[in-house]
Amino acid sequence: MSNSIVIIGSGFAARQLVKNIRKQDASIPLTLIAADSMDEYNKPDLSHVISQGQRADDLTRQTAGEFAEQFNLRLFPHTWVTDIDAEAHVVKSQNNQWQYDKLVLATGASAFVPPVPGRELMLTLNSQQEYRACETQLRDARRVLIVGGGLIGIELAMDFCRAGKAVTLIDNAASILASLMLPEVSSRLQHRLTEMGVHLLLKSQLQGLEKTDSGILATLDRQRSIEVDAVIAATGLRPETALARRAGLTINRGVCVDSYLQTSNADIYALGDCAEINGQVLPFLQPIQLSAMVLAKNLLGNNTPLKLPAMLVKIKTPELPLHLAGETQRQDLRWQINTERQGMVARGVDDGDQLRAFVVSEDRMKEAFGLLKTLPM
């Protein structure tokens, strides 16, 4: 059995793993190393900080010191890991090194910033640290441009709009949430955003940003431009794989792991947003929780495979909340859409009339768990 576990990272995945390990073993040596402060906060809250008037420090739930004391840990905050010597089982920073028996990479994912001229003017909201760096600018901004119409983009667009700001959202696609669902399914939310006053620039492309005396000039395709006070990149996340790559691990979109969360090195595991589990990157809370439960067992000597059930994804748009599950992005499904004043139920079925995906909104969200049970594993 392992007698020394080192975890690189301090986010939701790392903390879930620590809690699950400590439920089973109170004394095994645990060391966490991370580049941030290691204070705990709820990352989904970042989608609502502006309308709720929260400062970055308001998000803190537990300090690093309290976490270390509660779970009997050695913590090394504000520490950049530079290398992993997989053969010697050593993790290195500029001024320190740690021996491990088992190593877990929980390095998360970073916000992708489109490579356009002036990209340094774009803000990202992927961590408490990032919000702390730009909270004054965002609070003071009257005009906000959000680049990207996916999950995070529409959540932020609604939140900034609810806070009374003039919001423009730009995306290359013809509809919002284009990578998740067809336009006929997302149209209810798209209409609500427009009703609220969000200016949607779909089938549009950001070409560059330039600082001006009165704000930021965003140049778009088709000889268009708009001036705003802040620009937020919400164009997706990229798993942090640089450290794993330097350690010689197999990398695809994320750090490749099998059903046991094991990488191509038998003593190194990966968990959370940085991990690609049997070809899938799953940056949502429920698969991370289930993965942490399984990995804790395996680090303590078990051999338990991860089995993920059909899972709900919740879109945090309070004016028109949505839950979805299954293969909503499949192009070959027939969608049966029932829309009422209280909400929508959209069912995606295959050629054999088997339910493969669904999207529910508002008061109809209470039907989600019944539908979830009918989805194939």
Curated annotation (Swiss-Prot):
Gene Ontology terms, MF aspect: oxidoreductase activity, acting on iron-sulfur proteins as donors, NAD or NADP as acceptor
Pfam families the record matches: Pyr_redox_2 (PF07992), Rbx_binding (PF18113)
Cellular component annotations (GO), alphabetically ordered: cytoplasm
Catalytic activity, EC: 1.18.1.-
Pathway: Nitrogen metabolism; nitric oxide reduction
Xref: InterPro entries: FAD-bd_OxRdtase, FAD/NAD-bd_sf, FAD/NAD-binding_dom, NO_rdtase_NorW, Rbx-bd
Cofactors demanded by this protein: FAD
Protein's job: One of at least two accessory proteins for anaerobic nitric oxide (NO) reductase. Reduces the rubredoxin moiety of NO reductase.
Protein family per UniProt: Belongs to the FAD-dependent oxidoreductase family.
Name of this protein: Nitric oxide reductase FlRd-NAD(+) reductase
